[in-house]
Amino acid sequence: VTLCTIGDYIAMKLCGRQTPVIDASNAAGLGFFDAEKRTFNQTVLRGIGIDPAFLPGLTEDRFIGICRSRARVAAAIGDNQAGFLSAVRDREHEMLVNVGTGSQFSVFSSRCMTVPGLETRPMPGGGWLLAGAALCGGRAYALLADFFTQTARMMGMDMNAPYAAMEGLLKSAGRPEDVPTVLPLFEGTRQDSMQTGSTAENFTPLHLIYGMMDGMAHELHQMYQAYRAAGGTAKKLIGSGGGLRNNRFLCESFSRAFDSEITLSDGREEAACGAALYAAD
């Protein structure tokens, strides 16, 4: 019996292998993995009673076999890494912020770095991806929309399109000079689950919308600051995910927080696209 991820299992079945193999970018997600050495920590595994043979064998090869149609089958790779491969064209000079239901900051490094608040994940083909994920992320904006909906209902009004109403207010009113500080930590942080969201003064819908967007951008910018403090270099800012693609005002908040123009990635479904690009090379 061997453990593997669903991606490894599908790849194994496609090319008729009897046992699965795993890329380091996928293996790291199983735990007990030394990202710098790109191997499972067998000492730790044995120390807790797990036979290292229970885990799949690591492969450095891009292709692991051939399917019935004679097409080559690539090893499955990590979804974060796949999304980065699709969204970022120049990994040495670009970094990525993604806002969907959650949010994430990712930046490539040719050397293995340890950065507080960021995970060091192996990249397919070499190098590492430093990644930080907010627990709430893009859902903070959804919580704000739900707050406005509940407030309208409390006042006896129906609001079926809160996002359209919020966008209309942003378009018509402009950005106030006294936007409040908002911490959108409604589910805590990965370091402290007891931290919760908070706001300062200037409590109007317009101020709160801008404050929430600024807070979402600030949370990922803190990860970038930790990366720079650890010796990382400045890079061009790339954005992906529906949260950014569908909200130019949120893009402006990220540009303001990072003090950099943000460029949206070319396509959608970045993780699926990145996996295809990896297999096509």
Q: At which residue positions do the language-model features occur?
A:
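Active-site core segments that coordinate phosphate-bearing ligands/cofactors
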Residues: 1-19, 31-42, 46-47, 64, ...
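Nucleotide/phosphate-binding loop and acidic/charged catalytic motifs
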Residues: 21-27
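Short, conserved phosphate-binding/catalytic loop or strand-edge motifs used
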Residues: 27-28, 62
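A structural motif corresponding to the C-terminal end of an alpha-helix
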Residues: 47-54
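Gly/charged, well-structured mid-domain segments that form the phosphate/adenylate-handling core
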Residues: 57-64
